[in-house]
Amino acid sequence: MSKTPLTEAVAAADSQGRFLSSAELQVAFGRFRQAASGLAAAKALANNADSLVNGAANAVYSKFPYTTSTPGNNFASTPEGKAKCARDIGYYLRIVTYALVAGGTGPIDEYLLAGLDEINKTFDLAPSWYVEALKYIKANHGLSGDSRDEANSYIDYLINALS
């Protein structure tokens, strides 16, 4: 079983032959509330993925116009290049939803950030493009309250890792 604050609290209480304390139960309640917010955010982001990805790609093209005028496989000067850009932005968004469901940065760290520098150098991709895309998603996802806070925490984590 993987260790989490909840499993550690249960293990500690069990080893001491006691029920969970009020404080431990409050932590558990808070984690479940956070999980519900994360799941709601993941669902909303997934439902709006197409419009968020397209808007984010256009934000990248606006801020970095050379991406649509520079020829080559790694730029958005062709329909194929634009499709690759949208695919990559969609991947970033998908990983954010995985983190929301998992309740931690593990999916971001393991599926995205591990080896990302190598990929970006190999394919001449600029992290600043994805930072701009993520900023657009954060500003336009339409979430509110705890769901917004949960989503923004993972988007900010990713932006900081790319910056």
UniProtKB/Swiss-Prot annotation:
It is a peripheral membrane protein. (2R,3E)-phycocyanobilin binds at residue 85. PANTHER family: C-PHYCOCYANIN ALPHA SUBUNIT, PHYCOBILISOME 32.1 KDA LINKER POLYPEPTIDE, PHYCOCYANIN-ASSOCIATED, ROD 2-RELATED. Belongs to the phycobiliprotein family. The keyword Membrane applies. It is found in: Cellular thylakoid membrane. It holds the Pfam family Phycobilisome. Contains one covalently linked bilin chromophore. It comes from the Bacteria. The gene is cpcA2. Light-harvesting photosynthetic bile pigment-protein from the phycobiliprotein complex (phycobilisome, PBS). Phycocyanin is the major phycobiliprotein in the PBS rod. GO terms for biological process: photosynthesis. Keywords: Antenna complex, Bile pigment, Chromophore, Electron transport, Membrane, Photosynthesis, Phycobilisome, Thylakoid, Transport. One of its GO terms (cellular component) is phycobilisome. Its main location: membrane. This is C-phycocyanin-2 alpha subunit. Heterodimer of an alpha and a beta subunit, which further assembles into trimers and the trimers into hexamers.
